[in-house]
Regions:
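Membrane-embedded alpha-helical bundles that constitute the cytochrome b-like, heme-associated redox core
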Residues: 1-136
Length: 136
């Protein structure tokens, strides 16, 4: 992975976390426009969410695979840290899989992927917090 070799793993981890936080916040703004009237019908928020999603689509699987390989010894014993990491991995993949049809067809057309995407957003947020505060 040539791209990965240019970054220190810590820098890439921070980029992943920042993109997750941005995507979670912008997704909530887009999902609940009645709570944020100033963001209603904001094409800037939508475009930034889409572009950050493309970044996440490329970076997340690459970083996840390297992170899993780097911590393979820890994965052999079950802990809260391992469980939250597994939940992060699968919710991130689910967000990618459910986000692609939403991008192609729109959120007004596809109710089921929209609900899955929204639910996985909260799952990812919770697992990020849990992973951060779990004992290493």
């Amino acid at each position: 992975l040539i791209f990965y070799s240019f970054f220190l793993p810590d820098v890439l981890r921070k980029l992943i976390v920042l993109s997750c936080v941005f995507l979670i916040l912008s997704g909530i703004l887009l999902a609940y426009p009645e709570l944020f009237p100033w963001a209603e019908e904001s094409s800037a928020t939508s475009l930034l969410h889409i572009w950050a999603g493309f970044f996440f689509l490329v970076i997340f699987p690459m970083y996840s695979w390297d992170h899993i390989r780097g911590h393979a010894d820890r994965l052999k014993k079950f802990s809260l840290l391992t469980a939250s990491g597994i939940v992060q991995f699968f919710s991130g993949l689910g967000l990618i899989v459910s986000g692609i049809p939403l991008l192609l067809y729109g959120t007004d057309v596809l109710d089921f992927p929209r609900e899955i995407h929204l639910g996985l957003t909260f799952v990812l947020a919770g697992s990020l917090v849990l992973h951060k505060f779990s004992r290493k």
